[in-house]
Amino acid sequence: MVLPLILTLVIVAPIFLWMYSWYISAIPKHYVKPGTKLQKKVHSNLRILEQKYHPSWWCPFGTTQTVVRQIFRDCPSLPFTREIVEFDDGGAAGIDWLIPEGADDTTPIVVFLPGITGSTHDSSYVLHPVKEARDKGWKCVVVNPRGLGGVKLRTTRTYNAATPHDFAFIAKMINERYPDAKKLGCGFSMGGMILWNYLAMTGENADLDGGMIVSSPWDPLVASDSIECFIPQLIFNSFIAKNLVDMVRPYRELFKDMVDFDEVCRCNTVRGFDRSFVIPMYGFKSCDDYYRQATLATKVDKIKIPCVTLNSVDDYFSPVECIPTLDIMESDYVCGIITNHGGHTAFMESADPNARGMVEKLLSQWGNMIFHDYS
């Protein structure tokens, strides 16, 4: 009895998953203000908005996609060149350049911002889009926050989602070095929050020509509630909290007079880490105050360069009800894209976790628009 049952499941389960993945496939919803230049350019350049998004047949669910991409997607070895950026306060960060053959001072540049504890060589969700951009002939630079990417902290300043001043410094440096090159910022998760808050802070004076935000939480308070539910807490939140603690653990002596380091080391949620480390470090009144200042949803009207956002309904980190679609529809500069499936930064389409997915396709098409069809 057991063997026939197992054989039946082995045969039936893949068929069911394949049929289910096609059943749930749908054209992504998109939100863009009618009659604007942005709408015309989006409709003529973003072919992905005309095609159904087919999640991977064996991995159609958001949570499994996120886990599979994280565990099984490789980190391609790319010939980056490291540059150390020295900040005015004595701190430093590492940025990694990837320059294609034949590039010159006018070659377009994509500036990548990894997620909360991500850096150049350990973030497959960044490296595959970097490879996509490089293959298009674009220069790439990955911006690692202070304390990550192999550059040790020199001061007590780290990074947070509400304070994009380090990125502003780097974006200005890149723009001054390559004034004749168009530049696109591409941020993932918390990196997207930093990018969005930079664009909101600088408005039309941004040192970028366009933005792309992938899987960023629109409201950090609601996102924190979401990832503290049982399943995401077990799979994601506790893992990220451990990475955050491990990131600052070597600097106990540096921070001993500023935070309760024993409390920091006991954190098992992102909110707990924010409460015990980020809040006292940056002088926020509370987590609510920090999250209010970091939120994206209230700043759509402050974005003054073309920016596309990509989110999935089944992403625990970015509850879809927080996406300000009405505000986006009133903006001349923001296009919001929402898929029913895709998880957090995953957006798998092939059975192969390493294969090109929706993020790479969007980067290619949006980048072409910004660099060659938006002036």
From Swiss-Prot:
Domain AB hydrolase-1: 108-203
Segments traversing the membrane: none
Keywords from the UniProt entry: Hydrolase, Serine esterase
Pfam families with a match to the protein in the record: Abhydrolase_1 (PF00561)
GO MF assignments: acetylesterase activity; monoacylglycerol lipase activity
Residues annotated as catalytic: S189 (charge relay system), D315 (charge relay system), H344 (charge relay system)
The keyword Heme is annotated on this UniProt entry: no
Gene3D superfamilies assigned to the protein according to its UniProt record, in alphabetical order: alpha/beta hydrolase
Highest taxon of the lineage: Eukaryota
InterPro entries per the UniProt record, alphabetical: AB_hydrolase_1, AB_hydrolase_4_CS, AB_hydrolase_4_sf, AB_hydrolase_fold, ABHD4
GO biological process, one term: medium-chain fatty acid catabolic process
EC number: 3.1.1.-
PANTHER family reported for this sequence: ABHYDROLASE DOMAIN-CONTAINING PROTEIN, ALPHA_BETA HYDROLASE 1, ISOFORM A
Family according to the record: Belongs to the AB hydrolase superfamily. AB hydrolase 4 family.
Protein name: Protein abhd-3.2
